From Swiss-Prot:
Gene3D superfamilies: DD-peptidase/beta-lactamase superfamily. This is Beta-lactamase CMY-10. GO terms for molecular function: beta-lactamase activity; metal ion binding; nucleotide binding. PROSITE patterns: BETA_LACTAMASE_C. It comes from Klebsiella aerogenes. GMP binds at S88, Q144, Y174, T336, S338, N363. It catalyses: a beta-lactam + H2O = a substituted beta-amino acid.
């Protein structure tokens, strides 16, 4: 009897040990975690960020690192499926949609904007191209619409009366009304409204099945709350051409799929050509070269150069344009994005096969995002 009990307990112990060993194998520590934690943990503390989803691409493999909460009230944790507002990172998808319209023959970047909107005939947009709208070089359109422009009728009236401050193409003035109009007219050239075209054609083609302009009821539980400077839960408000300029909500997993598509391509030939078109430089401002949506730098790139290209001077002021710089075979593409309650950053280097997505539910300084991402990418490239 005693021998049988010894055998039984031995068998149980063996099974328990095997189970523990198997559990250990199922969740090994990601070798990149110390690298990511070293940059992200101090960021969360310093800027009181409730939650952040970081996704990293290296050697074709996705790595996910999630921190904090998506909703302070419910305590729901952040995951790679949590939906964040990505603000102006949306512009890279709007640009891809516009490039897709070009590839499909619905429009050309050299087309005058009024060609695709009869209501613009006789305005300054008879002399401004679609490409200039896409690259913020229409001649000084402002960062935002004036507050009183709160309807489609007022929006059309605003564009019809607007007069350029600079010759089209001569200056970059970062502008939601500029790329917003580009996205609106690009969708019109394909005979569809922007949001359905984005959600039903472009996003599925990119494999982004958990990305939305308008978050549907069944996905609302995944939609994080942003937090204001006063720590109040907030989400983006509707606005004129908000969908086109800063309206996308997505997860770190989906946004990394977009990065992967920009690095390795997609099966859809037209969509692949569109992605390639967004990478082409139109002009340079300092060390930054402006593509469609994406902004690029010769790689390797210093932290200082990245900070300069994403500085308040570049974002808020008009800057003279120069011929696009020759960047060689290695290029870093990046884009920042913010809403009142969210802060995003995306960067990738196709030649190295590395990329990073950082999504937070607080709008924290762009400088801090750049420094953290640059440090992580440097380790990935090493």
């Amino acid at each position: 009897m005693q021998q049988r009990q010894s055998i039984l307990w031995g068998a149980v112990a063996t099974l328990m040990w095997a189970g523990l060993a198997h559990a250990g194998e199922a969740s090994p520590v990601d070798p990149l975690r110390p690298v990511v934690d070293a940059s992200i943990q101090p960021l969360l503390k310093e800027h009181r960020i409730p939650g952040m989803a970081v996704a990293v691409l290296k050697d074709g493999k996705a790595h996910y690192f999630n921190y904090g909460v998506a909703n302070r009230e419910s305590g729901a944790g952040v995951s790679e499926q949590t939906l964040f507002e990505i603000g102006s990172v949306s512009k890279t998808l709007t640009a891809t949609l516009g490039a897709y319209a070009v590839v499909k023959g619905a429009m050309q970047l050299d087309d005058k904007a009024s060609r695709h909107a009869p209501w613009l005939k006789g305005s300054a947009f008879d002399s401004i191209t679609m490409g200039e709208l896409a690259t913020y070089s229409a001649g000084g359109l402002p960062l935002q619409f004036p507050e009183e422009v709160d309807s489609s009728e007022k929006m059309r009236a605003y564009y019809r009366q607007w007069a350029p401050v600079y010759s089209p193409g001569s200056h970059r003035q970062y502008s939601n009304p500029s790329i917003g109009l580009f996205g609106h007219l690009a969708a019109s050239s394909l005979k569809q409204p922007f949001a359905p075209l984005m959600e039903q054609t472009l996003l599925p083609g990119l494999g982004m099945h958990h990305t939305y302009v308008n978050v549907p009821k069944q996905a609302m539980a995944s939609y994080a709350y942003g937090y204001s400077k006063e720590d109040k839960p907030i989400r983006v408000n509707p606005g004129m051409l908000a969908d086109e300029a800063y309206g996308i909500k997505t997860s770190s997993a989906d946004l990394l799929r977009f990065v992967k598509a920009n690095i390795g391509g997609v099966d859809d030939k037209a969509l692949q050509q569109a992605i390639s078109l967004t990478h082409q430089g139109h002009y340079s401002v300092g060390g930054m070269t402006q593509g469609l949506g994406w902004e690029s730098y010769a790689y390797p790139v210093t932290e200082q150069t990245l900070l300069a290209g994403n500085s308040a001077k570049v974002i808020l002021e008009a800057n003279p344009t120069a011929a696009p710089r020759e960047s060689g075979s290695q290029v870093l593409f990046n884009k920042t994005g913010s809403t009142n309650g969210f802060g995003a950053y995306v960067a990738f280097v196709p030649a190295r096969g590395i990329g990073i997505v950082m999504l937070a539910n607080r709008n924290y300084p762009i400088e801090a995002r750049i420094k953290a991402a640059h440090a992580i990418l440097a380790q990935l490239a090493g």
